[in-house]
Swiss-Prot record:
Protein's name in the database: Large ribosomal subunit protein uL1
Subunit structure: Part of the 50S ribosomal subunit.
Species annotation: Natronomonas pharaonis (strain ATCC 35678 / DSM 2160 / CIP 103997 / JCM 8858 / NBRC 14720 / NCIMB 2260 / Gabara) (Halobacterium pharaonis)
InterPro entries hit by this protein: Ribosomal_uL1, Ribosomal_uL1-like, Ribosomal_uL1/biogenesis, Ribosomal_uL1_3-a/b-sand, Ribosomal_uL1_arc, Ribosomal_uL1_CS
Gene that this polypeptide is encoded by: rpl1
GO molecular function: rRNA binding; structural constituent of ribosome; tRNA binding
Domain of life per record: Archaea
A Pfam family of this chain: Ribosomal_L1
GO cellular component terms given for this protein: large ribosomal subunit
Keywords for this protein: Repressor, Ribonucleoprotein, Ribosomal protein, RNA-binding, rRNA-binding, Translation regulation, tRNA-binding
A Gene Ontology BP annotation from the UniProt entry: regulation of translation
UniProt-listed PROSITE patterns: RIBOSOMAL_L1 (PS01199)
Length: 212
């Protein structure tokens, strides 16, 4: 399967007209034979890509004390309990933060307050924070999340996720695609039989089918 994926990625990249901006490479997945009205059948996975996403991933950490200090070196923003309360009083600021942030990470002790102040904003967007347990290293967690994508179908049979950027090697992007498909094969009720078609494409380029 790896060779066929790499061939599809190579075609998608070579057939994409040159643009004056750096294009992403995206994966489009079409499901079949699933009742997506049932939340148990929906895809909702955070997947670490072995070759990275090829793009900046915006990460915000909710933390206090030493954890907050360590997070400042690696996260895009670090917010404490006072910031959290302020966001709870400013719905527009909370929505803006949610929209511009890819992933949130939070100390476990702050999760209850996050639910209280931001639950109605982050929950529907599927962006509730990843809890940081006392033994977790915040630096390692942030660095791992920088290479993570959220693969989510919702109620749609067709959904997309980022798998790289046009200046990455085709084999590196193929490795990312392979990891995503293998996770889906494991998670879906009927495995590969629940996947109708898979396509890879650059932002503005043609879609190229990935052979099953």
């Amino acid at each position: 399967m790896a060779d066929s994926i790499e061939d599809a990625v190579s075609r998608a990249m070579s057939e994409s007209p040159e643009r004056n901006f750096r294009e992403t490479v995206d994966l489009a997945i079409n499901l079949r034979d699933l009742d997506l009205a049932d939340p148990n059948n929906r895809v909702d996975e955070s997947i670490v890509l072995p070759s990275g996403t090829g793009q900046d991933t915006h990460i915000v950490v909710f933390a206090e004390g030493e954890t907050a200090l360590r997070a400042e070196d690696v996260a895009d923003d670090v917010l404490d309990s006072d910031d959290l309360e302020d966001l709870g009083d400013d719905d527009n600021a909370a929505k803006d933060l949610a929209d511009e942030t890819d992933f949130f990470i939070a100390e476990a002790d702050l999760m209850q307050d996050i639910g209280r102040y931001l639950g109605t904003v982050l929950g529907p967007r599927g962006k509730m924070p990843t809890p940081l347990q006392p033994d977790d290293d915040v630096v390692e967690t942030v660095n791992r999340m920088k290479n993570t994508v959220q693969v989510r179908s919702g109620e749609r049979r067709t959904f997309h996720t980022r798998v790289g950027a046009e200046d990455m090697d085709a084999d590196a992007i193929a490795d990312n695609v392979d990891v995503i498909l293998r996770r889906l094969f494991t998670d879906l009720e009927k495995g590969p039989q629940n996947i109708d078609t898979v396509y890879v494409k650059t932002t503005m380029g043609p879609a190229v089918e990935v052979p099953a």
